[in-house]
Structures are given as C-alpha cells and as structure tokens.
C-alpha cells in the first residue's frame, strides 16, 4: 500500500472500516488514495455448543474491537477526528445480522456459518426441486451460502429470535448502523443473500414467501456511495469519531476491492489471491450460468454485475505447505530478513515449467450447484530427489492455483461470451513475482499487479469520498487512483506446457472426485446440503 507521511495540503481524509473473516481494520486514506494509518484487530467466530457447523458473530465483543481499531488508526495518523470527512464500511459477504423492533442487533452469523445443511436440503426439494434454480436465475446465488436456509434454521431451532426479528442487514451495514443508528443494505453485499434481484437491485420478497419465510424483515436498499446518516453522540463516545461525521453506504469486500483496483468496466477481470482465490469478471448486463457453476453478484457500479468463481483454500494450502514442510526455510528466511514465501519462490524458479509433471489435487473449479472437492493430495510424484523435492512441490502448487483460476475463467467465458484481454492480480498472492508470471503463462494473458495491496479498503474509502462529494464518480475515481507496480507478459513456450498440464489436471481431478463419491477419501470441503 502507498504510505506517505508527508503533509496533506487539503487536510481532508477518509476512513474505511473493513470487516474481514479473520480481522477488522480501520484504515485512513488521503484524497490521493495513499494509506495514512490503520488499526487492526483479529476476531474469532466461535461455534455454538451442540450446533454443528455454526459460527456465531459476537456483536458486543466485535463492536468493541471496531472502536479500538478506529481509535488506533486516528492515534497512529496523529489526526484529530475532525479531519475525517466521511466513513464507509465493507465486510465479508454472506454474514447476516438481525435486529429487533427497537433497532437493536440481536443475532448474527459469519460468512462461514454452515449450521443450516438440513435446511438447504429442505429448500432444494421445494417445487419439485426447482426452487434453487428459480433463486439462482433471479439472484445469481444458490442456497448453499444464502440467508434463507439460515433464517429457516432460526425458525426451526430459535423461534424466539426469528419472531423478534424486524430487520435484516449484512455485517458491513451493521457497522454503519452502529455508527449512525440507521438501517439499510447495499446491493453488492445484500446480493449474496440470494434474496435480491440482479436486474432491479432490490429485494425479491416473493422468494422468501415461496420458502415459507417472513418477508417483512427486509431493510431498505441504498446504493454504495450514498449517504446513510451521521455518527451519533453514543457512537462518537465509543469510537472516537466526531459527532455528525457522514456515514456512507459501503458494500461487499470483493466488489469494493475491484473498485480499488480500477476494475469498473465491462470485461475487466481480476484474480484476487487470498485464503480463497476469487476470479471476477465484469459483465455488461445481468446474465446467469445455465449450468449454475458460477455465482453472479451485483457490482458496486450500478447496472453492472460480476461473475465470480472461487478457488477454495488456495492461500491456506500454501501456508499449510510452508508450515508443515519448510521449517528449515522459515528459519533461514528469518535470519536473512526475508519472507519465507519469497525464499521458496527463489527455489521454485529453478524448477522447469510443469514441475516435472507433479499434479496437486486441492481445490476444484467452482461448481456452485453441487460444490465439493476431492481429497487433498499430490499425484505423479517420483522418488528422484533431484526432481521431486520441496521446490518442485511449491512450484506445482503455484502452477495449480493458476490452472484452477484459468479453468474458472473458461467457465465464465463459456456462458457469458466475455473474454478478458488482460488480468489484474491482487491480494497476498500477487506479492509473488514467480506466481504472477505463472498466472500470465497459464492464462496466456498479460497480468498487471497494482501497487495498492489493500484494494478493498481503498475501494471503501472511494465510496466514502463520493458520498461526501469529494470525488465525482466511483468508477472514474477507482481508475484514477490505482497505480501499477508491474506487468507480466506470457511466455509462449510455457503457455504450451501449461495447456497440457491443465488438460491432465482436469482428467485426474475428475477421477479423484469418484473416490470421494465412493466414500474412500474425504473431501477438502463440501457445501451445506450435499
């Protein structure tokens, strides 16, 4: 991230609150998009005793952490609260919050909550098993990660909460509510509930009614970058912001991340490499996948949607490999003062493209309708230590992540007819120079890596700036503020190697899935209801 401590002539700053799966951040930017300071705190989503798959979002504790982060960011920046011209919030998608008639939050779950597996199955069976297709065709979402199964679970198991609830929002909107006292949702995040229409960008209460659920809990919809309200006296005392600071509608983390990357026009494409890898393609108009392999989300740019595929646990797989097998490299990296992944990339760069035919089996391509994966493994190892070693396996993992991304982009292109002419690679994965080059070689496309690594927070700050009139338009501002660190061009010889590796992986992965189907191996992950 660009960080500059020089004086800001305008004296005006923007704050973004970024509520991720594992942590929350308050980030301060100047009007040129430079990060000035940040406060961060980790949070944990605890399971509810005797509720398998549950991941409760602790509203009281997590609000205290948010306030702590805001105060920390202001202190680090050495800025008075009056310098903050506006604040917006973004969050992990899918996580929902319920409120009572007094507007008080009473229940919330994180995006990873999977307690409603039985309810997913029940809803799938509705209307001769056509209900999920109707939901997807309208909203771009399947039931696996949606809000309706969770609401049905509450109706079954916590009717006290279900009947108390008078409003529903996403976690980003909860942050804004705690600051302003106002309740609303934005399309980009609320779209992941499976209850919002891709075309109208408004709720579809008939979907809840078809599921036998209440439709009177849907909060007003406001677009990203519009004014929600102002910081209240109570919130100001708690978090340190000034009373009356404008609170602007934020949105979903990936969509705001794309705004921060300047991915705001049709056909522009990003690969965001974190714990999960998202492959995101801007579509010029709402369209869904007849095979239901890909999720479709509203962009923060009105009128535009994004096809999004997800590779599972890509970053987590690399961390597992580092921690399980590379203790020696971790010690060496510490002594040299370098990142362990950088050291492993230097080793892997000496391994030829194709990694001597080693095929990692971890995440499958995204199959949203029936989403599960094979058991983790490496296929086609040899016992030649010169060819099969840590460097080879590390390179094979990087190549495999790029291959799965390319396959997901192929699936999007097949139903949308949108073919990107370049990629933006962002997130933690883009720090790897070798990984960036491999992604270019596998896809055959130029790959641009931005200087800004925290693009989600920047996109959120842009929304805040538009909402208070400091920027004219979100899309144009995103394009203006993004700066590029490097562009990688595909190596034609490597492209040929990877085309064969891609075909081999697809065939081998299909066979590995049959082992899971027969109960012989354990899936890396499977969606609720399967």
Swiss-Prot record:
Pfam families: FGGY_C, FGGY_N. It is an enzyme of class 2 (transferase). Keywords: Cytoplasm, Kinase, Transferase. It comes from the Bacteria. One of its GO terms (cellular component) is cytoplasm. Its EC number is 2.7.1.189. The keyword Thylakoid does not apply. One of its GO terms (molecular function) is autoinducer-2 kinase activity. This is Autoinducer-2 kinase.
